[in-house]
């Protein structure tokens, strides 16, 4: 049979226990001893491994408990979503603050058609590209500006173009400027101030914005601007 306790001690000293102890105890058909070894310890890697093993055997409650001990909140939320416990998944994300768990929940909520909630959790996970995509597709224009201001420049420009098409020129100008596309911001500002060919739809207030922008640029502006 061999000295199991001694072998475990040596594996731990060598730092190979996460792989070797499960292998040894499985080979010796001592699964209960393996469960005791893992669950009485606090090794995150082993707890995750045991959780996956429990999940593969359909013992989802045990899997959930050990995923929680390992602070693998993504897996806890995944199990909750699989079982249809969406509200439980929401509570887990709220309590843990886990961004990966929030992203998984957002994808699940989107699949369920719960768009507003999906957008909120995409935002919580800092996946602003998905939040912006859904907000555009579902007419959530009032929230777009906030998402864009927290995102990278390419997304700011994308939202600015969307808002420009919707006639939200002031917001478009602000986003173009923040994204570093000053030339485009000036162009939109000027066109909005002048209106169409007949001068209709003019927004004289945009001249003030235009002046402020050109003053900020000063004499060091690129000739292209």
Question: Language-model features: where?
Answer:
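Extended alpha-helical assembly domains of large eukaryotic scaffold proteins
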Residues: 1-225
